[in-house]
Amino acid sequence: MKKKIKIFIDGACLGNPGPGGYGVIICGKKLYKEISNGYYLTTNNRMEIMAAIIALESLHDMYNIIINTDSKYLKNGITKWIKVWKNNKWKTNNNKSVKNIDLWIKLEYLSKKHFINWNWIKGHTNNIKHDRCDFLAKISAKNPNAIDKIYQKIKNF
């Protein structure tokens, strides 16, 4: 039987685009881990997806996971839209290129290693762990130390 854990994630951006960050909390039996980082120039949606990627990359075993996010973009993207996008050769229903393809591909790959229940939670409603992720994401956005190379390449920075 796979071990059970809960993951809380959040992304933030000071301006959109602008400096951004993510916050992650992973918790289970005998496990509590916080992860955060900030980027000089990115978007809020990229930070939401990045939070999920970083959380999954930090796991070394297979898990039964509940990922809690306040991003409907992330939840719907990975549970519904990605199938349509792939069938449409990474085009939306309006025939536009899907944004953040690099991150969606990576997230889908990492997600296949676990059984994941993607849970949407309303943000800023006194959920202690999610509020902590929000804090970590905002602090990281205020103190960036990394470059979102793909985003900056797309935007020609």
UniProtKB/Swiss-Prot annotation:
Binds 1 Mg(2+) ion per subunit. May bind a second metal ion at a regulatory site, or after substrate binding. Residues 1-142 form the RNase H type-1 domain. It is found in: Cytoplasm. GO terms for biological process: DNA replication, removal of RNA primer. Its cofactor is Mg(2+). It comes from the Bacteria. GO terms for molecular function: magnesium ion binding; nucleic acid binding; RNA-DNA hybrid ribonuclease activity. Its EC number is 3.1.26.4. Pfam families: RNase_H. Gene3D superfamilies: Ribonuclease H-like superfamily/Ribonuclease H. One of its GO terms (cellular component) is cytoplasm. It catalyses: Endonucleolytic cleavage to 5'-phosphomonoester. Mg(2+) 2 binds at residues 10, 134. Keywords: Cytoplasm, Endonuclease, Hydrolase, Magnesium, Metal-binding, Nuclease. Mg(2+) 1 binds at residues 10, 48, 70. It is an enzyme of class 3 (hydrolase). Endonuclease that specifically degrades the RNA of RNA-DNA hybrids. Monomer. Belongs to the RNase H family. This is Ribonuclease H.
